[in-house]
UniProtKB/Swiss-Prot annotation:
Protein name: Elongation factor 1-gamma 1
Superkingdom as given in the UniProt entry: Eukaryota
Record's subunit section: The eukaryotic elongation factor 1 complex (eEF1) is probably a heterohexamer. Two trimeric complexes, each composed of eEF1A (TEF1 or TEF2), eEF1Balpha (EFB1) and eEF1Bgamma (CAM1 or TEF4), are probably dimerized via the eF1Bgamma subunits. The eEF1B subcomplex with the GEF activity is formed of eEF1Balpha and eEF1Bgamma. CAM1 interacts with EFB1. Component of a complex bound to MXR1 promoter region.
Sequence positions bearing N-acetylserine: S2
InterPro entries reported for this sequence: EF-GSTs, EF1B_G_C, EF1B_G_C_sf, Glutathione-S-Trfase_C-like, Glutathione-S-Trfase_C_sf, Glutathione_S-Trfase, Glutathione_S-Trfase_N, GST_C
Amino acid sequence: MSQGTLYANFRIRTWVPRGLVKALKLDVKVVTPDAAAEQFARDFPLKKVPAFVGPKGYKLTEAMAINYYLVKLSQDDKMKTQLLGADDDLNAQAQIIRWQSLANSDLCIQIANTIVPLKGGAPYNKKSVDSAMDAVDKIVDIFENRLKNYTYLATENISLADLVAASIFTRYFESLFGTEWRAQHPAIVRWFNTVRASPFLKDEYKDFKFADKPLSPPQKKKEKKAPAAAPAASKKKEEAKPAATETETSSKKPKHPLELLGKSTFVLDDWKRKYSNEDTRPVALPWFWEHYNPEEYSLWKVTYKYNDELTLTFMSNNLVGGFFNRLSASTKYMFGCLVVYGENNNNGIVGAVMVRGQDYVPAFDVAPDWESYDYAKLDPTNDDDKEFINNMWAWDKPVSVNGEPKEIVDGKVLK
């Protein structure tokens, strides 16, 4: 009888459970979520991996829980003791859990705060990244100090602690821990190479390469300036100067493209004052729908593309705040809210924004990170779309994510 189905893909937290299935020779089918998309979405609305379905429809999520469950499925008692700790050795069991937790939470969280922005997957803020790197250094010191004196993290053999921690360290070795760093941390490097060569993980490292140098901060794209017209050969230098000055003056303050649409009958500032000073659901929203002109303004659902990389909710809210700050050149043509829903390490960003005109690009592309979001036009004559807008601006109802309600925990208003 089959022992179940494991959903796993390229994500680092799926490496260990997939490796356990192979090394322990479990009768567990391993499939990617994309290969069974409809079934996966029905069984696991959050669409997080790894995920496991056992006999009689038993469902399990979260990597540490799945790893434990898979080891317990093994008939090899010696291997179960090695990976989980002996039943009568409480200290070893606790240490195995401790090191797993440190890697799977504290260390893994910092991937989103260091590697992701350095790769351009999130806005880069030097102060934030430097602070996150300091946190990584402190965690690394804990590992290095342990491994200077011991072969493995928790016991005298490879345990789940080593497998989980090594898999998380992989992303750092690929991106941040270059040749110089590795020379300064020989104990971690020795341990990492030992664990990744084990039967549990060796197949995952076929294409692995150590980084030579750490990732560099992303470079801001410089706008190309139009070449200045060459002065006529017969003109004197003094005569050419006024023309150049005039060109420079006219290019200093380019008009916002939305200014070309002219003045609207819907007074945006009146709406912003109404929203700020009145109760949202009973007073402000009815006023909005009474005065809103769909020919002058369009409404858009804005969704962050990388919700699966978000960690702490306050950091997600800071991400929204930074995005809104970078939209400052367009705020006189916009209004909206982005909210953070869910909980730490399982949250997302979504919202509704109104912009002048029928195209979202001229309003949003003033922010360097505008392409980190998806934009879908909303139809205010559609009851579902209208209710979504009301909910995003009122913040008083849960967000529906794949049919599951998620409480709003924070948010920002663009006004």
